[in-house]
């Protein structure tokens, strides 16, 4: 993890100080198309695994629409989807036990969101909230950080956010390391460190101090419908962000073809290095296209 963090931090510094995006514009032309395909593949995989009935599908569609067209709060979409599916599954029991159906992480995120603080603390807390809400891995962090850093705080543009994802896709580290890039652009070196710390802190603290409690929640039949609903909301959120990413990264017929081809390869092949090869391949092809055709 440390090598990936240091690489991302170094590239983030170059991105800002050496205007890397301008110098590597031809490379990013294809890389961004690959990012759209990568996130789209995550949506398909999550949906095929967790959307198992019509109500869950409807909740995913609702989460997609609310996020894309109404800019609804990430947390409210997830809580709403969870409560809606709980009501659908166990309406009468829910009325009698409503207070037991609010997972601590979601409540904590709502409280954290109400605090007015300095920039450094904001960066850390946005990372912490993203870490607390990592349903489904790194891909769930993408819509949350996109909403927080681009739409709410305006630390980055959509294009810069996608650049960060593209860089993260080629590093020898989990994709979630792109959060270091977001933090650096938001607040410099300290911002990169604080965002990364916030993201990864729950992953270290929860297993050590809250493992038994979290396992109990996951295995509790009363809570399971809520968590299934939350997962459906996550699918909708990531789908909405996929559309936003593609809207920014697919700028012509060539990038559209690259995105479709990248999605097809990612969907069919599941090797450990597939993502790296696809992202680098799209970057190289895009650079050639920019130099010769576009």
State what each model feature region is.
Residues 1-171, 175-294:
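Multi-pass membrane proteins that catalyze or facilitate reactions on polyprenyl-/lipid-phosphate substrates
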């Amino acid at each position: 993890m440390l090598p990936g963090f240091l690489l991302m931090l170094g590239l983030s510094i170059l991105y800002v100080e050496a205007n890397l995006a301008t110098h590597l514009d031809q490379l990013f032309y294809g890389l961004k198309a690959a990012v759209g395909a990568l996130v789209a593949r995550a949506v398909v995989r999550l949906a095929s695994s967790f959307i198992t009935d019509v109500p869950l599908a409807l909740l995913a569609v609702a989460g997609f629409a609310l996020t894309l067209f109404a800019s609804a709060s990430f947390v409210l979409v997830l809580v709403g989807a969870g409560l809606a599916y709980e009501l659908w599954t166990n309406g009468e029991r829910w009325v009698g036990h409503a207070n037991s159906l609010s997972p601590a992480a979601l409540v904590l995120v709502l409280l954290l969101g109400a605090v007015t603080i300095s920039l450094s603390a904001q960066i850390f807390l946005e990372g912490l909230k993203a870490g607390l809400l990592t349903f489904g891995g790194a891909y769930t962090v993408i819509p949350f950080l996109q909403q927080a850093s681009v739409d709410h705080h305006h630390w980055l543009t959509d294009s810069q956010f996608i650049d960060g994802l593209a860089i993260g896709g080629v590093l020898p580290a989990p994709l979630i390391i792109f959060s270091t890039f977001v933090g650096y652009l938001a607040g410099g070196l300290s911002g990169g460190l604080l965002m990364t710390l916030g993201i990864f802190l729950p992953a270290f603290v929860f297993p050590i101090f809250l493992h038994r409690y979290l396992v109990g929640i996951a295995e509790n039949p009363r809570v399971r419908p809520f968590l299934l609903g939350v997962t459906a909301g996550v699918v909708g959120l990531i789908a909405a962000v996929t559309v936003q990413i593609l809207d920014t990264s697919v700028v012509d017929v060539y990038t559209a073809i690259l995105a479709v081809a990248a999605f097809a390869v990612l969907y069919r092949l599941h090797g450990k290095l597939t993502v790296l090869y696809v992202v680098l391949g799209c970057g190289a092809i895009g650079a050639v296209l920019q130099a010769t055709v576009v």
